[in-house]
Amino acid sequence: MAKTLLFIVNPRAGRTRSMGPLFEAVAHFGQEGYLVSVRQTTHPGHAAELAEAEGARYDRIVCCGGDGTLNETVSGLMRLPDPPPLGYIPGGSTNDFAASLELSPDPAQTARRITASQGRALDVGSFNGRPFVYVASFGAFTRASYSAPQSIKNDLGHLAYLLEGVKDLSTLRPY
């Protein structure tokens, strides 16, 4: 029986707007013996919904998007009693998590690494019942990471967060 892989893609994430490189990744998974099902997210929270609803039926899950897509996918998988292994292809505007693991921004190269690797365990934190894999934040500039418009993040990367944070400077109060 063929191995199965659910490929969750956020088409709105920074670099995933060009699907050509993603086709190479899907082709690689197929060459490695996986029957691949591709699902594109359509709204915030959709990656979590897909991972939870469909994840148990697959041998492996791979998500492609930014840090938010990864976090959503992990959130959905954490609701399963026995989640399958997860691979991550960075496709967001800043990809902080991928940079911390030295993952390639090239989808085909990362796909090869996913299939060649035995994987590694990563810690998953939880705050108020919400899982996270990279960052849990609070404080003065937390809003900036959620409020920066996607189009600006796509164009400016990390600078978009800085510009969004400047908007809050006048509202800061000393403690």
What are these regions (language model features)?
Residues 25, 47, 73, 97-98, ...:
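Hydrophobic packing residues within well-ordered alpha-helices of enzyme cores
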Residues 32, 41, 79-175:
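Catalytic core of DAGKc-family lipid kinases
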